Swiss-Prot record:
Reaction(s) catalysed (UniProt annotation): methanol + A = formaldehyde + AH2
Function: Catalyzes the oxidation of methanol to yield formaldehyde. While the in vivo electron acceptor is not known, N,N-dimethyl-4-nitrosoaniline (NDMA) can serve this function in vitro and is reduced to 4-(hydroxylamino)-N,N-dimethylaniline. It is also able to use ethanol and formaldehyde with an activity comparable to methanol, and has a weak activity with methylamine as substrate.
A GO MF term: oxidoreductase activity
Organism phylogeny: Bacteria, Bacillati, Actinomycetota, Actinomycetes, Mycobacteriales
Organism: Mycobacterium sp. (strain DSM 3803 / JC1)
Name of the featured protein: Methanol:N,N-dimethyl-4-nitrosoaniline oxidoreductase
InterPro entries (alphabetical): ADH_Fe/GldA, ADH_Fe_C, Alcohol_dehydrogenase_Fe, NDMA_methanol_DH
Family of this protein: Belongs to the iron-containing alcohol dehydrogenase family.
Subunit structure: Homodecamer.
GO BP annotations, alphabetical order: methanol oxidation
Listed EC numbers: 1.1.99.37
C-alpha cells in the first residue's frame, strides 16, 4: 500500500539504546577496587577534574590499589571537556601502557573519558572527527568504570558524550557524539559521594536532571519507552532537589536525586533532548559556563517557547512538579509548569539570567582555564553574541528533537531574555 509522505511522522523508526551494568546505592563506591579487579584491570588511567584534594580521589584510589590495580592519574579535565583534554589523556594512556579507564566526577570526567576511549581505539585520530552519530569504526575500546560524584550528568548511563572543539577560538564549537561503543562498562552511583558537593553546584546539577527528564517527555521523537522514566525523574527532582541543596547530608534527598539522575539518563538515552541543551552547549562554547547552570537558566524560557506545541505534555509536567492542576484547563496547567520551574530555580538560588553569572561562583570545576582563561567573567548580551549563540543552536545535534520549530530569528529573543531578562 502506498503511503503519502505527509502521513509519515518526523521519526517513523525509533531506536532503543542499551544501558550499562550499574551499581546504585549507599556504599556502592566501596567495591570499586573489587569490580576493577574482576573486570581484569591491571593498570588503569583515572580521569577527573578538580576533585584532587577533596578526599574522594584519594579514597577511591586507595580502594583500587588495594586490589592490586595500578593507578595513573590524569586530573586535568576541564569543565565542558575540551578536545585537548581528551587528546592529552589518550596520549598518557598509551605512554603509561594502561589497559582501562576509570572516570570520577560529573559529566565532564565521564565525557572526556569516553572521548579518550574513542581516540585510543582509532590510533590517535583527533577527537573532533567523531562528532555525530556512530562515527566509531573500531568498537573495541578500553573498558571503563564511571563513578559519579554529582547528581546531574546521566553520562554514566548514556551513549552520548559532549566535547568542545577549540581548534578555532573565534568560532568555538561544542558538539555531541552518539556512539554505543562509548557506553561505559560499569556505572557506579553512590549518594554518599554527593555529600561534599557545594550547594550551588548541587542546584545546577539538579536542573541538568530536570532538563534530562523533561526534554524527552516533550520531544518530537515521542519515544514511548522513555516517557515513564522521563516523567518520574521530573517528579523526583521536584520532590528532592530543595532538600538536597539545603540539607547536603540528607540521605533520602541525595538518594532521590541519584535515582532521578539515573532514570533521566535512561530517558534521554533513546528519547532525545531539545533546545534547553542546545542553548546550554552554545553558551558554554563561547563562555565556558557551567552546563547545569546553563540548563537552569534556559529551561523556563524554553518551556515557555515550546508550550504551543505540547500543551498537554507540559500540563502533565506541572502535575509532576507538584502543582495541583485539578481545576485548571490544559493551557493553564501548562503555564503553571513554567511557573513551577521558575519557582524551583529561585528557591535553590539559580541566577535570573546569564548576565548575573560570574566565574568566581565556581569551585573545583576548572572553569575558564586553558584556552578559556577569562572568557566567562561576563557573559555578553550584545547583538553579536546573541546572534552567534542563536546560530550555534541551529547546528546542535539536540535541536532536531525540539517539539517546536527552531530558527535563528526565533531564538534571538529567547537567548536575549536568557542573558538579560528577568521573571
Amino acid at each position: 500500500m502506498a503511503i503519502e509522505l505527509n502521513q509519515i511522522w518526523d521519526f517513523p523508526i525509533k531506536e532503543f539504546h542499551p544501558f550499562p551494568r550499574a551499581l546504585l546505592g549507599v556504599g556502592a563506591h566501596d567495591i570499586i577496587g573489587v569490580e576493577a579487579k574482576n573486570l581484569g584491570f591491571k593498570r588503569t588511567l583515572l580521569m577527573t577534574t578538580g576533585l584532587r584534594g577533596s578526599g574522594i580521589i584519594e579514597e577511591l584510589t586507595g580502594k583500587i590499589e588495594y586490589q592490586g590495580v595500578e593507578v595513573v592519574l590524569y586530573d586535568k579535565v576541564e569543565s565542558n571537556p575540551k578536545d585537548y583534554n581528551v587528546m592529552e589523556a589518550a596520549a598518557l594512556y598509551q605512554q603509561e601502557r594502561c589497559d582501562s579507564i576509570i572516570s570520577i566526577g560529573g559529566g565532564s570526567s565521564h565525557d572526556a573519558a569516553k572521548g579518550a576511549r574513542v581516540v585510543i581505539a582509532h590510533d590517535g585520530r583527533n577527537i573532533n572527527e567523531f562528532e555525530g552519530f556512530a562515527k566509531s569504526t573500531n568498537k573495541q575500546n578500553p573498558p571503563h568504570i564511571a563513578v559519579s560524584t554529582t547528581a546531574g550528568t546521566g553520562s554514566e548511563t548514556s551513549w552520548a558524550y559532549v566535547i568542545t572543539d577549540t581548534s578555532d577560538m573565534e568560532h568555538p564549537h561544542k558538539w555531541v557524539g552518539f556512539d554505543e561503543a562509548t557506553i561505559v562498562t560499569l556505572a557506579i552511583d553512590d549518594p554518599l559521594l554527593y555529600y561534599t558537593c557545594p550547594q550551588h553546584f548541587t542546584a545546577y546539577c539538579g536542573f541538568d536532571v530536570l532538563a534530562h527528564g523533561s526534554e524527552p517527555y516533550v520531544s518530537r521523537l515521542d519515544f514511548a519507552p522513555s516517557l515513564g522514566n522521563a516523567l518520574y525523574s521530573v517528579e523526583l527532582v521536584a520532590k528532592h532537589l530543595r532538600e538536597a541543596v539545603f540539607e547536603p547530608r540528607n540521605l533520602k534527598a541525595r538518594e532521590g536525586m541519584m535515582n532521578a539522575q539515573y532514570i533521566a539518563g535512561q530517558a534521554f538515552n533513546s528519547g532525545g533532548l531539545g533546545i534547553v541543551h542546545s542553548i546550554s552547549h552554545a553558551v558554554s562554547a563561547f563562555f565556558d559556563s557551567h552546563h547545569g547552570l546553563n540548563n537552569a537558566i534556559a529551561l523556563p524560557r524554553v518551556w515557555e517557547y515550546n508550550l504551543p506545541s505540547r500543551y498537554e505534555r507540559y500540563a502533565q509536567l506541572a502535575t509532576a512538579m507538584g502543582v495541583d492542576t485539578r481545576n485548571m484547563t490544559t493551557v493553564q496547567a501548562a503555564d503553571a509548569a513554567v511557573e513551577a520551574a521558575i519557582r524551583l530555580s529561585q528557591d535553590v538560588g539559580i541566577p535570573d539570567n546569564f548576565s548575573q553569572v560570574r566565574v568566581d561562583s565556581y569551585d573545583k570545576n576548572r572553569m575558564n582555564t586553558g584556552k578559556y582563561a577569562g572568557k566567562g567573567e561576563v557573559i555578553k548580551g550584545d547583538d553579536k553574541s546573541v546572534l552567534a549563540i542563536s546560530e550555534h543552536i541551529q547546528g546542535d545535534w539536540c535541536t532536531p528533537g525540539n517539539p517546536r520549530e527552531v530558527t535563528v530569528d526565533s531564538m534571538i529573543p529567547v537567548v536575549g531574555h536568557a542573558i538579560n531578562g528577568t521573571y
